[in-house]
Amino acid sequence: IMGRHAYGDVYKNCEIEVKGAGKAELVFTYEDGTEERKTIMQMKGPGILQGIHNTEKSIESFARCSFRYALDEKVSVWFATKDTISKTYDGKFKEIFQRIFDEEFKAEFEKAGLEYFYTLIDDAVARVMKCEGNILWCCKNYDGDVMSDMVASAFGSLSMMTSVLVS
């Protein structure tokens, strides 16, 4: 079973194509007018930029829905990101999933004989190809889009895949 976060990432992104050299920055302006600013890159020529986002509230909701669904279906949860590269964005997903599990679901999972397992997305891809099932593999929006197609193709057919929106 694939669990795909249905908010944010590249599906609510902002992109620009730059025509020449310049400084690419990420800027956040708080309601009080103060700013956080980070240089992404000093572009030496034309290129492309993409900004993505997510909210803690949405990630928390995804985590809770995932753990509840897994308990209902009596399956363990795998969660995978690339937090070794995306330390802030993917790291926040990892942190929230772990906190929600520890504070709200750990006892229920132990009682049901189920597990929560975090790993890097690379490792999850390798593991899922050998997996006999009985898991809910949770991914961020884009990762879940791509990986659900891979799983459906490897274990049947894209045309046989079904989707259920859970909130």
Residue ranges and their predicted role:
Residues 16-24, 93-100, 154-164:
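A glycine- and small-aliphatic-rich helix-loop capping segment at beta-alpha/alpha-beta transitions
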Residues 12-17, 88-93, 128-131, 148-152:
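Short acidic, glycine/serine/threonine-rich loops at helix termini
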Residues 128-167:
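Glycine-rich phosphate/nucleotide-binding loop
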Residues 26-28, 113-116, 160-167:
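Short, acidic/small-residue loops that bind anionic groups at enzyme active sites
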Residues 1-36, 48, 142-146:
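N-terminal glycine-rich phosphate/adenylate-binding segment common to multiple enzyme folds
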Residues 124-126:
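RNA-contacting regions in translation and RNA-metabolism proteins
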Residues 28-32, 36-121:
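Glycine-rich phosphate/diphosphate-binding loop of Rossmann-like nucleotide-binding domains
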